[in-house]
Amino acid sequence: MVFTGKCDLRSPLLGRRLRLGFIGGGKGGLVGRWHFAGARLSNHWEIVAGALSSDPENAHASAAEWMIAPDRSYSDWNAMATAEAARDDGIEAVSIVTPNWTHHRIATAFLKAGIDVILDKPMTTTVSDARELVELQRATDRLVIMTYPYAHHAMVRQAKHMIRNGAVGTVRQAHVEYVQEWATAPFSSDAKGAMWRQDPEKVGRASATGDIGTHAYHLLHTLTGQDIARLRAEFHTCGAVKAMEDTAYVTFRLENGAPGILWVTQAAPGQYCGLRIRVWGDRGGLEWDQEKPEALRYVPLGEQEQIFVRGHGSGIVPEAERLIHLPRGHGEALVDAWANLYAEAGVAVAARRAGYALPKDSVELSGVEDGLKGMLFIDACADSHESGGSWVSINGESIPNFC
């Protein structure tokens, strides 16, 4: 096995692209297109196999579009796990981009087949299933990489390391929101994605909180380096009448006691994909907006504001520069964040297969522990809402007060 040892995000470590399979992502899906584009743009993966739809006709038609050979287009993910594990040229990782309720059993099958897993969020629909995957990952010693793409924007990485390096001082408060409009009006009868997102048998205890709240929670954790220790939550339906919440208001305390607010809604007309975060400390504040991903606003206490723009040099930290591929003025956006995620996943999978220990922080990926934390967050929000908005402790520790 050739191992180059390079960690360039556009240079595969094994001197070749890794073989990747997909579960889900075929025609009619949305998230699968982003995964597909990110994997291709990363230059680390060849997509060689897939069970792209639960509808066999759609699965094979989608495979033809993706240039997957007919004998490696599967109608059943379980058959794919068995067949690919038995091949000398079988897939080296699988990307699971199916709806929430299928994640646990599909990931289980591929981990047991000895195949590394790239898994869409949320990890599962229950905390117990998430814990099972954590234990299985440890038992099989295979990777489970959770796909939180926003953390792979260059300017999110910039913000993360600026905060780690003391740019805002001690974190004193944080506000994060993810606001959309698509669930405002009544759903049409053929809106399959919208319908299953309102079915507790398929999504678990929360709808919008699991769908986009987990992204907001993960971004908060990524930037501050802290988990939410306790929270109180209220679920609301602010759009057309539906079975589960389309809006959640969450008040929280971080591990150091700093207060904050997390707000998610899918029923705010005029809001498209408004993932925004603001973190303030005793020395300054940072702001980032997913709809303007190339800019990061930083205001040191008592000084003029600074706008960091994605590009090389001019204050961009090395950890963020690794995620930058074009000069300033040549736009990079969400598909580039997906490509960065798949590139870092490629580095991690290649290193594991070669038995090579990557240098600390050479990749910054989310694993099974992050997936479990996302499920604990959803459960805590649901527990709080169901108890009338009471405070719920996630880690059981006492919380100091700043405000």
Swiss-Prot record:
Pfam families the record matches? GFO_IDH_MocA, GFO_IDH_MocA_C3
Q: Provide the top EC class.
A: oxidoreductase
Q: Signal peptide span per the entry?
A: 1-63
Molecular function GO labels: nucleotide binding; oxidoreductase activity
Query: What EC identifiers does the entry list?
Result: 1.-.-.-
Q: Does the keyword Metal-binding apply?
A: no
Q: What sections of the protein cross the membrane? A: none
Q: Which UniProt keywords apply?
A: Oxidoreductase, Plasmid, Signal
The UniProt record lists the keyword Transferase: no
The entry's family comment says: Belongs to the Gfo/Idh/MocA family.
Q: Which PANTHER family is this protein grouped with?
A: CONSERVED EXPRESSED OXIDOREDUCTASE (EUROFUNG), OXIDOREDUCTASE
Q: What is this protein called?
A: Uncharacterized oxidoreductase y4hM
